[in-house]
């Protein structure tokens, strides 16, 4: 089944891409959720418009991503204070959303939580962690997060 994506789909493509998928995946997942439309001549013209708009935005996006990268690198180590149960174990865990909040609180830019990659699913110990931040295709940086006990 040939479809045109309307939004970014992980491991498949971005908005405006024409993709060939199995019928069941297209009918049962992509089409009902509005992630894709059936490829017709009119839809292909619409996809070309989406693609051109995305390319224009991408040029601005790379410049903006480099500015955000400079801002993050200028922060240095980001301190994240959490409640602990003793012996360095946390109550709960530190998620990507918590890291994004700590970066914002330290005077950094507002990021999407999907841009931050944690070493495992979540951070569950006190310590210093170096995390990857993917801002744009080809633009990434690292941020050091110091997880410390509250009080």
Swiss-Prot record:
Pfam families registered for this protein in UniProt: Ribosomal_L9_C (PF03948), Ribosomal_L9_N (PF01281)
Biological process according to GO: translation
Cysteine pairings via disulfide bonds: none
Gene Ontology MF terms: rRNA binding; structural constituent of ribosome
InterPro entries in the cross-refs: Ribosomal_bL9 (IPR000244), Ribosomal_bL9/RNase_H1_N (IPR009027), Ribosomal_bL9_bac/chp (IPR020594), Ribosomal_bL9_C (IPR020069), Ribosomal_bL9_C_sf (IPR036791), Ribosomal_bL9_N (IPR020070), Ribosomal_bL9_N_sf (IPR036935)
Keyword line: Ribonucleoprotein, Ribosomal protein, RNA-binding, rRNA-binding
GO CC list: ribonucleoprotein complex; ribosome
PANTHER family per record: 50S RIBOSOMAL PROTEIN L9
Family designation: Belongs to the bacterial ribosomal protein bL9 family.
Described function: Binds to the 23S rRNA.
Protein name: Large ribosomal subunit protein bL9
Species, as recorded: Mycobacteroides abscessus (strain ATCC 19977 / DSM 44196 / CCUG 20993 / CIP 104536 / JCM 13569 / NCTC 13031 / TMC 1543 / L948) (Mycobacterium abscessus)
């Amino acid at each position: 089944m040939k479809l045109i994506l309307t939004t970014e789909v992980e491991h498949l493509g971005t908005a405006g891409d024409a993709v060939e998928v199995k019928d069941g995946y297209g009918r049962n997942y992509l089409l009902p959720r509005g992630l894709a439309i059936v490829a017709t001549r009119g839809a292909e013209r619409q996809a070309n418009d989406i693609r051109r708009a995305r390319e224009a935005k991408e040029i601005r996006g790379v410049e903006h991503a480099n500015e955000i990268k400079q801002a993050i690198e200028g922060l240095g180590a980001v301190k994240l204070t959490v409640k602990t149960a003793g012996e360095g174990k946390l109550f709960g865990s530190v998620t990507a959303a918590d890291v994004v909040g700590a970066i914002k609180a330290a005077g950094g830019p507002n990021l999407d939580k999907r841009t931050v990659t944690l070493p495992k699913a979540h951070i569950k110990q006190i310590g210093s962690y170096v995390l990857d931040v993917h801002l744009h295709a080809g633009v990434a940086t690292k941020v050091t997060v110091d997880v410390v006990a509250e009080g």
